[in-house]
Amino acid sequence: MSDSGGFDSHPHVALIPSAGMGHLTPFLRLAASLVQHHCRVTLITTYPTVSLAETQHVSHFLSAYPQVTEKRFHLLPFDPNSANATDPFLLRWEAIRRSAHLLAPLLSPPLSALITDVTLISAVLPVTINLHLPNYVLFTASAKMFSLTASFPAIVASKSTSSGSVEFDDDFIEIPGLPPIPLSSVPPAVMDSKSLFATSFLENGNSFVKSNGVLINSFDALEADTLVALNGRRVVAGLPPVYAVGPLLPCEFEKRDDPSTSLILKWLDDQPEGSVVYVSFGSRLALSMEQTKELGDGLLSSGCRFLWVVKGKIVDKEDEESLKNVLGHELTEKIKDQGLVVKNWVDQDKVLSHRAVGGFVSHGGWNSLVEAARHGVPLLVWPHFGDQKINAEAVERAGLGMWVRSWGWGTELRAKGDEIGLKIKDLMANDFLREQAKRIEEEARKAIGVGGSSERTFKELIDKWKCNNNTH
């Protein structure tokens, strides 16, 4: 609170995240930033969560920020068989969307604004429009991916045939004001017009122009050209302001010490500076046994020290296999003298900030890429699904890292151990990438510092929300 008054003189912002750590994490970090900027914050939650990690994360957040109000949103019964999807996270998005019309009682005045997850915006907008409540979107991927999402409905309309199908004649998708995006980089689920993902993708894409603004966890040095094009209204006519508020910083509770983190940090302390390649594919990706073996062989053949985080199942509640079962006995024995392999939660921020870490092999999840940028760690991006190829292109364009297009993605992953090893060697020995990464790290520090671009953006938003206090 400021000296000039109590809570009522400050904006009151509600946030409604969606399922998955990739969506929840930036929401909680944004909420923490809003608290630090003297906003009142309400967090709208749904239970049970899909993963145990989500439940724990929300619990730790609310304990760390007791001034945040939690409101639980009770969803209508939902039959997964009624949706054309099997992904548990996608099904939860749909369950929230189908219950969105019941949100109004949780949005009772006085609220200055609601910040909605991108996956929910088309379902939530009618509620906020009816309440005359400003609705902002937190887009949880790159600005480059947002440019595709916002322009895709118009692109589909221009490619539709008389039979209702969509045909793309070229190998690229043209986006006004920006370089074209290879068709091969577009998430395959978007191209299946009958899929649940494609339907909601189009509906959400059409809704941005009706929102009051879009917040993105990015900053100028990472995606300058894309942000300029978006705010110049060159991508989509009538698009509201796009606010680059990144890099969003980890909450204090994320820095908690536990036996696993202590073990990892102790091991890193014993390694030479810049010698370790960190390998992690996020909270949702579990490699096949075959691809896990190829990656292990690649790490060994690279000759580099490594810290490798593995997953056995997509949903952590179902992941009961031991590390030895995931890796196999032979690979487990081979790697123990060259690296450390863990199969549990890792404090990624502490890992990336450690002096021993000199490179990061990532799946291309946007939160991970922004964390690498903030710590100046060069990237080898290995996209697997969703927005990850487009995120990889953004990283490559910024000079922060590289990716190998021939490695495939989804069910077509085809990277071999020797290729992986060579690319990791290249990553760890690439002076140009290292210099670029350090430059971007410095720009990230400036963006969130006093008078920086992201700090100014937060103040601009808060000033807007203060004005809303007078009318809501």
Curated annotation (Swiss-Prot):
Reactions catalysed, semicolon-separated, are: a 3'-hydro-2'-hydroxy-beta-oxodihydrochalcone + UDP-alpha-D-glucose = a 3'-(beta-D-glucopyranosyl)-2'-hydroxy-beta-oxodihydrochalcone + UDP + H(+)
State the tissue distribution.
Expressed at low levels in leaves, flowers and immature leaves.
Residue numbers binding UDP-alpha-D-glucose: 140, 346, 348, 363, 366-368, 371, 387-388
Q: Which residues form the active site?
A: 23, 117
Q: How does its activity hinge on pH? A: Optimum pH is 8.0-11.0.
GO terms (molecular function) for this protein are: 2-hydroxyflavanone C-glucosyltransferase activity; UDP-glucosyltransferase activity
The superkingdom of the source organism is Eukaryota
Q: How does activity depend on temperature?
A: Optimum temperature is 45 degrees Celsius.
Return the PROSITE patterns for the record.
UDPGT
* Matches recorded under InterPro entries: UDP-glycosyltransf_plant, UDP_glucos_trans, UDP_glycos_trans_CS
Stretch list, region UDP: 283-284
Q: Which Pfam families match?
A: UDPGT (PF00201)
Role description: UDP-glucose-dependent glucosyltransferase catalyzing the C-glucosylation of 2-hydroxyflavanones (2-hydroxylnaringenin and 2-hydroxypinocembrin) and phloretin. No activity with flavanones, flavones or flavonols. Exhibits C-glucosylation activity toward 2-phenyl-2',4',6'-trihydroxyacetophenone. Can use UDP-xylose as sugar donor, but catalytic efficiency is much lower toward UDP-xylose than toward UDP-glucose.
Give the protein's recorded name: UDP-glycosyltransferase 708G2
The organism's taxonomy opens as: Eukaryota, Viridiplantae, Streptophyta, Embryophyta, Tracheophyta
